[in-house]
Amino acid sequence: MTLAYDRVGSGPPLVLLHGVGHRRQAWTAVVPRLRDQRELIMVDLPGHGESPPFQPGGREPVQAMAEEVIAFLDELGLERPHVAGNSLGGALALIAGSEGRAATVTGLSPAGFWVHRRQFSYAKAIFKVMEVTGAGIQGSAPRLARSTTGRALLFAAVVSRPSRLSAEQALGDTQAFMIARPAVDLILANPLWFTAPIEEQVPVTIAWGTKDRLLLPSQADVARRQLPHARHLPLPGCGHVPMTDDPDLVARVLLDGSTLPTPTEPAATAEPAESAPDRPAER
């Protein structure tokens, strides 16, 4: 399967994976902040955006999607790039790390760390509401996307500052969600529980929006227990999709996450990238 992607910038390659129901343009706000220091590869996941339909073919859906992403890395000749993702994309980045295909992993509110199954049912219900709402407002979506109130109605569940979405981006994201509905239904058929071990020499960063209303911040505690060697950070004031809520903060997290030293490197090399302001406080 050939996936749709954009490739910009220069530096070490950083693959960016969006969440379920989203598209590669999820990363638009952080691109100008990173492109001078990273080669950025933003990809539409199978069944999303401009990529071909998702066909798991009897495989477990999330694992099937991870296999497609790894095959995509092979197509581009990327042996062990830095990999980062949001939500489902964060889970896929972690799977890549567990399979030795990522130099570093950064997960922004990654899926797979439920406190209990009810949290999955809650998230699934939100997606169902979004699906029904999207189907019901298709004719009026352009008008809603142009208004601050309309963007709040459409995106309050996934961003904390919907007014920061442009009308064009809001409309595109609404249309992308409807395109991805078959893939969303497959992914949400059963909960993903991330339990795969990641070698300690693979630097991992987990960052969670403190105002995440979809994958609740309590799941960050599960991630901390599951991945004790990772760096765990809050994203103050950010919702589930933090890239537009605070692109400066997210860019710093991505930059730092893809420059963390391995345990074999001297401690003196563990410095933030030159242009990055102070790192967010660990928690």
Pin down the residues of each PLM region.
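Conserved HGGG/HGGXW glycine-rich cap/lid loop of the alpha/beta-hydrolase fold
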Residues: 6-54
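Conserved acidic catalytic loop of the alpha/beta-hydrolase fold
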Residues: 63-81
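Conserved alpha/beta-hydrolase catalytic His-Asp/Glu region
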Residues: 141-198
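Catalytic active-site module of serine/aspartate enzymes centered on a nucleophile-bearing elbow/loop
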Residues: 229-283
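Gly/Ala-rich beta-loop-alpha elbow adjacent to hydrolase catalytic centers
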Residues: 85, 89, 93
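Flexible "cap/lid" loop of the alpha/beta hydrolase fold
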Residues: 102-138
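Conserved serine/cysteine hydrolase catalytic core
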Residues: 179-225, 234
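Residue in the alpha/beta-hydrolase core beta-strand immediately N-terminal to the catalytic nucleophile
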Residues: 44, 82, 104-106
